[in-house]
Amino acid sequence: RQYVAQALSDEAELSVAGQVVPLSVFCDTGFHLQEPLSGRAVVLVRLDAVSLPTELRAYLDACLAGVGAEPRPEWGVRFVPCQTVAGHCLLPALPAALGSNGRKQDGIYAAFCDMPPPPGGWTALVSAETAALLGK
């Protein structure tokens, strides 16, 4: 099976935790993360690429470092299982919306990872299904 990644738009915006964050979004046809309880779509966001409130950022950093931390209930944190060639992990995720090309997908989750900047400079990955809903 061949996987394809392509840039969607330099003007995508993620609404998360009361913030609107600009993203460089890539569509990866091999990307299939879903929030397990609701089955909702997930956008994978590089944590270092976005600006979030200090307390929330500290919580997400602790989660990704494997340090137990208690989230504030109003954040609505869920954990999304992720399987890669490097192994299995649980990524912290927050309720979000993603907009691009005049379209918006509400009711999704933004899962955060701590990976270094990849080639192409994307800050978020979406599935082909999410890309189609955004008009790509």
Task: Give the ranges of each region predicted by the language model.
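Canonical alpha-helical transmembrane segment with a positive-inside/aromatic-interface signature
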Residues: 1-36, 41-44, 51
